[in-house]
UniProtKB/Swiss-Prot annotation:
Keywords: Menaquinone biosynthesis, Methyltransferase, S-adenosyl-L-methionine, Transferase, Ubiquinone biosynthesis
Annotated residues for binding of S-adenosyl-L-methionine: 74, 95, 123-124
PROSITE patterns for the chain: SAM_MT_UBIE, UBIE_1, UBIE_2
One GO biological process term: methylation
Family, similarity comment: Belongs to the class I-like SAM-binding methyltransferase superfamily. MenG/UbiE family.
Highest taxon above the source species: Bacteria
Primary role: Methyltransferase required for the conversion of demethylmenaquinol (DMKH2) to menaquinol (MKH2) and the conversion of 2-polyprenyl-6-methoxy-1,4-benzoquinol (DDMQH2) to 2-polyprenyl-3-methyl-6-methoxy-1,4-benzoquinol (DMQH2).
Reactions listed under catalytic activity: a 2-demethylmenaquinol + S-adenosyl-L-methionine = a menaquinol + S-adenosyl-L-homocysteine + H(+); a 2-methoxy-6-(all-trans-polyprenyl)benzene-1,4-diol + S-adenosyl-L-methionine = a 5-methoxy-2-methyl-3-(all-trans-polyprenyl)benzene-1,4-diol + S-adenosyl-L-homocysteine + H(+)
Organism: Idiomarina loihiensis (strain ATCC BAA-735 / DSM 15497 / L2-TR)
Name of the protein in its database record: Ubiquinone/menaquinone biosynthesis C-methyltransferase UbiE
Length: 251
């Protein structure tokens, strides 16, 4: 019988051994961590802030809740959740990459956000938390980098409290053929050059474009969430489907 770790899996448009992908993704984010926020603003023309704000507005997070921000990176969502949960609540910023986690921790501490935020280096596929721990779980622009997405969805469901919700904000498939063509041109011709100029790294942004294309589309991800055990799963397209916000509940 073949070892599952020896099976091939997508890394952008490349096929790599399953047990190699995490290290390859780690290399990407080690490289881009220092310029991650700057590149996000440039790549999305600042629109990523609106996508994240909408996600926060849809989260239902309120005072006293416990929130898990997976692939929380530089802490954009965590910072807002920290204000919402107050001193009685807690936000756990989790990221598999230590460089991204350090950038996020330093940024939030510089802003004086220290009392109710905890930082954990964690793999979304094997979350190191007890069952039924969190009221809300978010993962923004991180699921496409996970090796075993189905396993990660199940892991998130396990640590979600009954009555809790998960929100997945991720690049998706534009609904218009014209927009899709423009998006392809921008992604494959502009992004890598921008990455080279700003972050001295075109390869990581080539991977970014490829990983977006290989990520499940809106309906496929919805079906994956339902298969993992989430209920009342829905999604909303933003910016013509360039990004989609999926929501699911645990009852």
């Amino acid at each position: 019988m073949n070892d599952k770790n020896e099976e091939s899996i997508d890394f952008g448009y490349q096929k790599v051994a399953r047990n190699q992908k995490k290290n390859l993704v780690a290399d990407v984010f080690q490289s881009v961590a220092a310029k991650y926020d700057v590149m996000n603003d440039l790549m999305s023309f600042g629109i990523h802030r609106l996508w994240k704000r909408y996600t926060i507005d849809c989260s239902g997070v309120r005072r006293g809740m416990k929130v898990l921000d997976i692939a929380g990176g530089t802490g954009d969502l965590t910072a807002q959740f920290s204000r919402r949960v107050g001193a009685e609540g807690e936000v756990v910023l989790a990221d598999i990459n230590d460089a991204m986690l350090k950038v996020g921790r330093d940024k939030l501490r510089d802003r004086g956000i220290i009392g109710n935020v905890r930082y954990v280096q964690a793999d979304a596929e094997e979350l190191p938390f007890d069952d039924n721990t969190f009221d809300v779980i978010t993962i923004a622009f991180g699921l496409r980098n996970v090796t075993d997405k189905d396993k990660a969805l199940r892991s998130m469901l396990r640590v979600l409290k009954p009555g809790g919700r998960v929100l997945i904000l991720e690049f998706s498939k534009p609904v218009s053929a014209t927009l899709n063509q423009v998006y392809d041109f921008y992604s494959f011709n502009i992004l890598p050059k921008m990455g080279q100029v700003v972050a001295n790294d075109s390869d990581s942004y080539q991977y970014l474009a490829e990983s977006i294309r290989m990520h499940p589309d809106q309906e496929t991800l919805k079906s994956m969430m339902e298969a993992a055990g989430y209920e009342k799963v829905d999604y909303q397209n933003m910016t013509g489907g360039v990004v989609a916000l999926h929501r699911g509940y645990k009852f």
